Amino acid sequence: MTSQVFRDFKKSSISTSKIILIMVIPYYLLAELLIYFELMPYIAGIFSPFTELLNLPPETSLAIAAGVFFNLYAAVAFAAPLGMNIYEWTILGLFLGVLHNMLVEVSILKKIGIPVVTSVSYRFLMAFFAVSPLILLPKNFFLSNPDSIFKPLYEIKVKNYENFMSFFTNTFFDSLILSVQIIILVSLVLLMTSFIKNLSFLKKINHQVALTSSILSGLLIGIVYGAGVLLSEAKYMTKKQIYSSCFFLMTAHAIIEDTLLFVYFGANVWVLTLFRLFLAIIVFYLIMTFYQTPVIDKQYH
């Protein structure tokens, strides 16, 4: 089992490292270029009503857009140069923890039977619902030092460059450092998830515990892996079980990797983790309790 774990880890870490480099460096450079040429205020202004709802600076609009449509690596690349405080990183991490990588994940959920409109609208509403306590209550209700900046290294530095070449060289170097830091962080998580994926109860799933296996897989590893379990076991599950599992995972998935990406910049780990888990459990309970499976559809085929 150990050799298989390291083979899986090597394969996944190499592919993930490529994705991180491809996503982080260009987006980080783009974010800094927009700041350098003072274009960020114009672009951010378009999304200012949206960011105002989240109590975030307008400049985070690009990070939100990148995270929603692509992945969290792209979002972090845009947000890293903005010098955000712990409160802002926590809101951004919680919001995007629910609502990210929609282009890929929506299509995966569609294969299981969740309509695109349903998954998109649910995750938008749940993302805003998840952050509402942070927005409506005082900043220090959940966070002890909400206004402190955990990583001052990433404060905006627009006028400290002698010329454009100096700016570009330093920014490219910073993007490489950020990429390496994220790769190290994610690699540690991948090593753990490679071990989890090779556990016997996940490799040889008992059809009677397919619901538990899909939720546990998606919660620890990601919605793609959890959905993969659902796809392979759907014929043994009722539609109620499939729906409850999918809606749970749309609220909380990849709880380790996604959380640590934002905790690295100062986001509160307990808020990011417990808020999503609490909402996911409530949604799961409501579906399992009140969803009525049609008589002709007692088992999903």
Residues of each region from the PLM?
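Extracellular/periplasmic helix-loop-helix junctions in multi-pass membrane proteins
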Residues: 262-274
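Short loop segments and helix-boundary regions at transmembrane helix junctions
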Residues: 113-121
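Helix-coil boundary and interhelical linker segments in multi-pass alpha-helical membrane proteins
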Residues: 36, 80-87, 140-141, 267
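Membrane-interface capping segments at transmembrane-helix boundaries
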Residues: 288-301
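Hydrophobic alpha-helical transmembrane segments
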Residues: 32-42, 61-77, 120-129, 158-165, ...
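Selected transmembrane alpha-helices and immediately adjacent juxtamembrane segments
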Residues: 1-50, 126-205, 274, 278, ...
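Hydrophobic faces of alpha-helical transmembrane segments in multi-pass integral membrane proteins
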Residues: 22, 26, 30, 66, ...
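Alpha-helical membrane segments and immediately flanking helix-loop junctions
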Residues: 57-114, 208-262
